[in-house]
Regions:
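Active-site rim recognition segments
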Residues: 135, 288, 295-320, 324
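Extended, small/polar residue-biased N-terminal targeting/export presequences
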Residues: 4-56, 122-147, 327-328
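Beta-propeller domains
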Residues: 3-11, 44-46, 78, 94, ...
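Cleft-lining beta-strand/loop regions that shape enzyme active-site pockets
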Residues: 1, 64-65, 69, 86, ...
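A generic structural motif
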Residues: 53, 114-118, 296
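PDZ/PDZ-like domain segments forming the peptide/carboxylate-binding groove
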Residues: 43-96, 170, 293-294
Length: 328
């Protein structure tokens, strides 16, 4: 069926798509192929990390919000919300003009911004170093986490803590460990958000982390100052999950549910709790997945292609999400 396409495959991008189509016939997770070009000299738009005002109709770009950690978010900068960027490195920005090409390949390089404050009429210049698209995504992620944390704080009247685990690896685990036993150590319970987590291998560490039981209470001179274990969460928890959970991010809520550690809320997680080996070919750019290990859950059922339903199903309405409201 796929042989007819072979005469027309003359590059690895198309070959990866064809391999993915063929593997897709197996209807299993952790399959498919991809192409990672090795060259790093292509176009790359640097970022100033702010939200433009969509209602601005004049020349330049008016700033609606400066993202925390942005190159514009500096102690010695006069740039603030409402200021208009009129030119980048001397190139004027006309009304409605696509100004992003002016930042091509300029990540980490000094860039001169021409600025105007419509309120005061003041005009001036500042030099900043734009960041990469990857760093911008990191700042946006942290912005999202802060807003979720603030919402949990508000809705629980300060009684519950919140932590999001972005991946199943050592770094994200250290982040939530620090968050839970730092900011939230005195909270009555923890909301652990796993949404959009692409997986890894952390299910054992997380279930151990959340399954602590108090065996000692420290009481010097009659005053309670803490409990042991000190490195495991012993209070209630709840896990938020959605359709974006994958691989070990399915394994974890499945194990969490099977062990009776708490309840889950959100949307159905696809049955993708399977171990995989990603094989890279000799060119170093073309890779494909080889699923190797399936798992039986606490009910003796295979997790692959066996989805997990939440205890409390809540679907986020995209219209409300656009308003910044997270119903889950």
């Amino acid at each position: 069926e796929y042989a007819k396409f072979l005469p027309f495959i003359d590059n690895n991008i198309d070959l990866a798509d064809l391999i993915s189509e063929i593997q897709g016939e197996l209807n299993a997770s952790h399959l498919g192929s991809g192409y990672r070009p090795r060259g790093r000299d292509g176009d790359a738009t640097a970022q100033l990390a702010f939200f433009p005002d969509p209602d601005h109709t004049g020349d330049g770009v008016r700033i609606a919000e400066i993202i925390e950690g942005s190159p514009l978010d500096a102690a010695d900068s006069e740039i603030e919300v409402g200021v208009v960027i009129t030119a980048i490195d001397g190139a004027a920005i006309g009304a409605g003009e696509n100004w992003y090409p002016l930042l091509n390949r300029k990540a980490g390089e000094p860039v001169r911004l021409s600025l105007t404050d419509p309120g005061s009429g003041k005009s001036w210049h500042e030099t900043v170093k734009p960041i990469s698209g990857g760093k911008l995504r990191g700042l946006l992620y942290q912005r999202w986490v802060r807003s979720r944390r603030d919402e949990v704080e508000r809705l629980s009247d300060g009684r519950l803590g919140y932590a999001h685990i972005r991946g199943m690896s050592d770094g994200p685990y250290r982040e939530i460990y620090e968050e839970v036993f730092g900011r939230h150590t005195e909270k009555e319970g923890i909301v652990l958000d796993t949404r959009f987590n692409g997986g890894g291998n952390l299910v054992e560490a997380l279930t151990t982390f959340l399954s602590g039981e108090v065996y000692f209470t420290a009481v010097p001179r009659g005053r309670v100052i803490g409990t042991e274990p000190g490195g495991r969460w012993t209070k209630p928890s709840i896990v938020v999950m959605n359709e974006g959970n994958y691989s070990d991010a399915h394994c974890f809520p499945s194990a969490y549910t099977g062990l009776g550690l708490g309840e889950t809320v959100g949307m159905q997680v696809p049955g993708t709790c399977t171990s995989v080996w990603w094989e890279t070919l000799h060119d170093g750019a073309l890779y494909f997945g080889i699923p190797e290990v399936g798992y039986l859950d606490t009910n003796g059922e295979i997790t692959e292609n066996n989805h997990l339903d939440p205890d409390h199903e809540i679907d986020n309405d995209p219209k409300l999400e656009a308003e910044g409201r997270d119903q889950q």
